[in-house]
């Protein structure tokens, strides 16, 4: 069979890439990414898997007469942390798929 060796080599490369990507996913699980808003008045920490693990709100951010502002700060900090987590994931996993012409990756 012609080309069989190439297919085997490609399968080995794919298995190796899958293993490396699984290892990176585990590392991302342990990463902590912080998003802030309001000049640091609100900080949200997420994992590389985008699980919120901590929310810090400084006392000066709490105004009982303006709860909406605090909500906006929490949302902004959360979105920043999630975006940073996406960027980190893309950076870490993207290096393993560079050069491959696989649809959807």
Swiss-Prot record:
Gene3D superfamilies: Nucleoid-associated protein YbaB-like domain. One of its GO terms (cellular component) is bacterial nucleoid. Residues 21-33 have a biased composition (Basic and acidic residues). Residues 7-16 have a biased composition (Low complexity). Keywords: Cytoplasm, DNA-binding. One of its GO terms (molecular function) is DNA binding. Signal peptide: none annotated. The keyword Transmembrane does not apply. It comes from the Bacteria. Residues 1-33 are annotated as: Disordered. InterPro entries: YbaB-like_sf, YbaB/EbfC. It is found in: Cytoplasm, Nucleoid. Binds to DNA and alters its conformation. May be involved in regulation of gene expression, nucleoid organization and DNA protection. Belongs to the YbaB/EbfC family. NCBIfam families: DNA_YbaB_EbfC. Homodimer. This is Nucleoid-associated protein SAOUHSC_00444. It comes from Staphylococcus aureus (strain NCTC 8325 / PS 47).
